[in-house]
Structures are given as structure tokens and as C-alpha cells.
Swiss-Prot record:
This is Putative ferredoxin. The keyword Zinc does not apply. One of its GO terms (molecular function) is metal ion binding. To E.coli YkgJ. The keyword Iron applies. Keywords: Electron transport, Iron, Iron-sulfur, Metal-binding, Transport. InterPro entries: Puta_zinc/iron-chelating_dom. The lineage of its organism: Bacteria, Pseudomonadati, Pseudomonadota, Gammaproteobacteria, Moraxellales.
């Protein structure tokens, strides 16, 4: 399967996770969020408005998926949003659903030349 190396700013171009999953969280996390962006699910859980439907898209998501996006509540986003990490399973599942190439994470140690091999000069 084709994949690409994740860059630090990849999330600013993607946004697929914000338009693929229901973003539910413990109700108290919503206290710092704008009220119109949150809807109750159960007595103890809430979700981001726009994500509890067949074709979810978080109302806090701005921009165009795969081009340039942002989160209007990034500083106070839920723990659910914070858990999704670039190039993890959830990230790539959402990217594939939006016809975006999956990402791979390359650690700096893995990307350095292997000392067992001759370097091309």
C-alpha cells in the first residue's frame, strides 16, 4: 500500500479525523467549549456537534479536508481529539475514508544512515 512520511504540519492539511469519527467525551470537558459546538449524548457523555451523524464533520473544523484545515477550539479540544496522533491507526483509517494517502511515522533514529553500510559521497 502506498504511504507517505508524516510531516509535523500534516494535520493542518488533513482534517480527516474531524470528519470521520463521532467525537464523544465526558460532559465536563465541554465546559470550556462554545455551547453551540457541543451536544449531549447521555447523562455523562457529550459529543462535538456535527459528528453524531452518518457523514460526520465536526462543527469546530474549518477549511477543506486534505487541503488546509484548522480547529476553532484547538486549545480546549476534547481528550478524544488529543488522543488521535499523526500516522496512528485512527488517523490513517480516517485518511483512507477521505481518499488520502496513509501516513507513516519515521523516528529520527530510523532516518539516519546505518553505519553498517558505506555512504555515497
Amino acid at each position: 500500500m502506498l504511504s507517505q512520511v508524516a510531516t509535523p504540519d500534516e494535520c493542518l492539511r488533513c482534517g480527516a479525523c474531524c470528519a470521520h469519527f463521532r467525537v464523544s467525551f465526558y460532559w465536563a470537558e465541554a465546559e470550556l467549549m462554545e455551547e453551540h459546538l457541543v451536544e449531549p449524548l447521555t447523562p455523562v457523555y457529550s459529543c462535538m456537534r456535527g459528528t453524531n451523524q452518518p457523514e460526520p464533520r465536526c462543527q469546530a473544523l474549518t477549511g477543506e479536508i486534505g487541503k488546509e484545515v484548522g480547529c476553532s477550539i484547538y486549545a480546549v479540544r476534547s481528550s478524544t481529539c488529543r488522543e488521535v496522533q499523526i500516522a496512528d491507526e485512527q488517523c490513517n483509517k480516517a485518511r483512507l475514508a477521505h481518499q488520502l494517502i496513509p501516513l507513516i511515522q519515521v523516528s529520527p533514529a530510523d532516518s539516519e544512515n546505518d553505519h553498517d553500510y558505506d555512504q555515497v559521497s
